[in-house]
């Protein structure tokens, strides 16, 4: 702007006249923009900007569905104000994972009398509080809750039971042996059950899976269309789920089209379950199936079940041979365009014709992979992890080359050994591997401390494409991939579920030694990548590929790195530090690496990740610098979860944990801090107090691609 007395040039005046105020946009455009703003911000902040935004912020198209899930800055006062302002307008409310809100705040949901869909998973909820709430929500049709110790269905009022009788969709997470509210939901069409019951109470008492079964406690499954059960490890969870299934086996619902049970380890099949599966084979047609491996191994069930336009299959950890996959699942190679998601994790024989004679180091039958790709051409989610899938040297028959035809893939999980390019390199062509990777993996290359060992101009080099490997070609063919997992076939996390930390790990597959920094750099092609997992890549020497990913994958939100390079040294630390400086959108970071030194340099680089919300470090014999952690938490205002399990002493861990809580709890209501020695005998007791949302999504390692059907719970 010109000051008084100055002439305004024509260029300046024209620039001002062409400038457009945001408020000059049409209401339709502004509403579209406001859809990307959390409703809590719209109601509590944006509407106060001006009169126009005050009206638009309360538009029913914006306020009918409210999500507080992962809105970590919302506190009890904001929730109360939000419910007072727009409670009557809300039809869908998602408060899942709001573990920090007190029960009195959850009571405010009663103001939303027009609610149709309510998600309170992970919230503080008693049977009395639930009864009072549901009594006021007569229009409710979809409900998600937790059932905690002390839950008593006899506390539910008749008005509450009347509401439950109209509920069509129920998601129930069980922390105690109970039917919960299932017997009251007489019109259920979709039932999702998550069994998280521990075998022992806090006092050390053994928990029994027996339930008081009476006439009024029997679930009603006659209208059921979708049944899903996910079990945490432990015999009690198996015992309780059998009671749910026993009722289902008496009369199989005619409309059942999705039957899914996810159970780790061995899960013996009972007589009731066998009767249920036999009944399903006779009476229902499915479009989604997942069963424990022990129920399918050696069974003719797949041959007898009927499918119609299937959208999801999970045969995780089944001894399914390639011949069975082609004949029984892929219907002899016929069109399966309807299939959206396929989980073959842990199916070690699924790409080989015969499972009886195959050894881990044997090569796959590429014709089976070719049939899979041709039949399921619209696959969006594919998991082939936890197995050895070794390709032959035949030209054009590598697994990566075949998977490149799945142009619709959004998420992909592969074992590290499956992407190894073992074809001989002609003498006139340069090797794909960097020169540093030529070092024998058995001997560590000496590294000068404080000196970068990866090329300083690696980002410039990234613009000049190297001789393409089969993995490079695969990713080049999947430009819209959003989630990628490369997991060593013998990798196991040092922190398993409900057990002491694992002190030793299995050696990586020999073929994984062919996968190094160049293959990791290829991931930088994925411009839309949001989630990346790299686990057990022994030939990562400098980590130069990580820098390329950080610079190129600007949408990366979740990063999990585990056991990269040699176990005795963290040689990729300089590259990791440079990578983190580029990760502006990163929200979740999980690092699992023995001897990892979480020092000031690391945390200073991590401070560049301004969007970071959750951090988990797991390091056997690792160390940390408390002052650096405090400085990092001060700089990164969005961080609400800090989990560190290292080799530090209990005294150091407790002192740091208390300091973090004291300094930041008041300003960050959702703050969850756990600093604890990894190999301490009380680790499992500490873990049980971690909110399930954090434990399941980041602290515990697992493959997440095709873990559940897409949109299982909207």
What is the predicted role of each segment?
Residues 13-16, 25-29, 40, 59:
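Intracellular innate-immune signaling modules
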Residues 1-16, 29, 77, 154-171, ...:
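C-terminal capping region of solenoid repeat domains
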Residues 55, 67-119, 123:
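F-box-proximal linker/hinge
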Residues 27, 42-60:
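Short helix-loop-helix/strand-helix junction enriched in hydrophobic and basic residues
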Residues 117, 121-126, 133-136, 140-147:
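Alpha-helical bundle protein-protein interaction modules that mediate dimerization/oligomerization
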């Amino acid at each position: 702007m010109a000051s008084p007395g100055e002439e305004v040039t024509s260029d300046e005046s024209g620039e001002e006249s062409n400038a457009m105020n945001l408020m000059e946009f049409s209401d339709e455009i502004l509403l579209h923009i406001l859809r990307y703003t959390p409703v809590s911000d719209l109601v509590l902040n944006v509407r106060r900007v001006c009169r126009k935004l005050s009206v638009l912020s309360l538009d029913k198209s914006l306020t009918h569905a409210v999500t507080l899930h992962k809105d970590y800055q919302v506190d009890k006062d904001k929730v109360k104000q939000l419910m007072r302002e727009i409670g009557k307008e809300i039809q869908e409310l998602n408060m899942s994972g709001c573990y920090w809100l007190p029960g009195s705040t959850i009571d405010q949901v009663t103001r939303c009398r027009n609610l149709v869909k309510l998600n309170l998973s992970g919230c503080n909820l008693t049977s009395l509080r639930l009864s009072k709430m549901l009594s006021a929500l007569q229009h409710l049709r979809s409900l998600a809750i937790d059932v905690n110790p002390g839950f008593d269905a006899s506390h539910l009022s008749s008005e509450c039971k009347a509401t439950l009788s109209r509920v069509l969709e129920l998601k129930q997470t069980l922390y105690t042996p109970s039917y919960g509210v299932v017997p009251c939901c007489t019109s259920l069409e979709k039932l999702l059950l998550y069994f998280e019951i521990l075998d022992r109470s806090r006092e050390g008492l053994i928990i029994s899976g027996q339930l008081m079964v009476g006439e009024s406690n029997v679930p009603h499954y006659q209208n059921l269309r979708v049944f899903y059960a996910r079990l945490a490890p432990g015999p009690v969870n198996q015992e309780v789920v059998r009671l749910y299934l026993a009722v289902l086996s008496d009369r199989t619902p005619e409309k059942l089209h999705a039957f899914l049970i996810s159970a780790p380890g061995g899960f013996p099949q009972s007589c009731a379950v066998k009767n249920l599966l036999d009944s399903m084979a006779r009476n229902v047609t499915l479009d989604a199936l997942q069963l424990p491996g022990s129920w399918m191994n050696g069974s003719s069930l797949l041959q007898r079940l009927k499918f119609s336009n299937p959208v999801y299959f999970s045969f995780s950890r089944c001894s399914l041979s390639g011949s069975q996959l082609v004949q029984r699942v892929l219907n002899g190679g016929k069109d399966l365009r309807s299939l959206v998601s396929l989980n073959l994790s842990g199916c070690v024989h699924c790409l080989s014709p015969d499972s009886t004679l195959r050894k881990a180091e044997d090569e796959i039958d590429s014709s089976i992979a070719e049939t899979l790709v041709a039949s399921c051409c619209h696959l969006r989610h594919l998991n082939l992890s936890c197995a050895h899938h070794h390709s032959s040297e035949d030209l054009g028959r590598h697994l990566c080359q075949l998977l490149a035809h799945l142009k619709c893939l959004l998420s992909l999980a592969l074992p590290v050994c499956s992407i190894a390019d073992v074809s001989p390199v002609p003498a006139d062509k340069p090797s794909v591997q960097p020169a540093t990777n030529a070092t024998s993996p058995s001997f560590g290359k000496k590294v000068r401390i404080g000196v970068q060992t990866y090329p300083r101009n690696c980002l410039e080099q990234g613009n000049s494409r190297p001789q393409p490997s089969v993995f490079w070609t695969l990713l080049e063919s999947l430009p819209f991939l959003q989630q990628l997992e490369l997991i060593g076939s013998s990798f196991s996390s040092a922190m398993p579920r409900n057990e002491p930390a694992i002190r030793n790990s299995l050696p990586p597959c020999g073929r994984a030694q062919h996968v190094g920094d160049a293959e990791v750099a290829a991931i930088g092609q994925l411009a839309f990548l949001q989630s990346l997992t790299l686990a057990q890549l022994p030939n990562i020497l400098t980590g130069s590929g990580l820098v390329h990913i950080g610079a190129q994958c600007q949408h990366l939100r979740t990063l999990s790195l585990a056991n990269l390079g040699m176990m005795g040294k963290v040689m990729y630390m300089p590259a990791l530090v440079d990578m983190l400086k580029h990760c502006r959108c990163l929200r979740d970071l999980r690092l699992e690496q023995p001897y990892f030194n979480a020092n000031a340099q690391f945390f200073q680089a991590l401070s560049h990740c301004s969007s970071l919300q959750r951090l988990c470090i797991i390091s056997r014999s690792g160390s940390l610098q408390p002052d650096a952690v405090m400085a990092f938490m001060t700089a990164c205002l969005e961080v609400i979860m800090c989990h560190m399990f290292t080799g530090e002493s209990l005294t150091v861990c407790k002192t740091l944990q208390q300091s973090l809580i004291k300094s930041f709890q008041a300003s960050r209501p959702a703050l969850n801090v756990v600093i604890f020695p990894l190999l301490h005998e009380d680790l499992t007791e500490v873990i049980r107090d971690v909110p399930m949302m954090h434990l399941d999504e980041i602290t515990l390692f697992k493959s997440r691609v095709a873990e559940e059907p897409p949109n299982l719970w909207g």
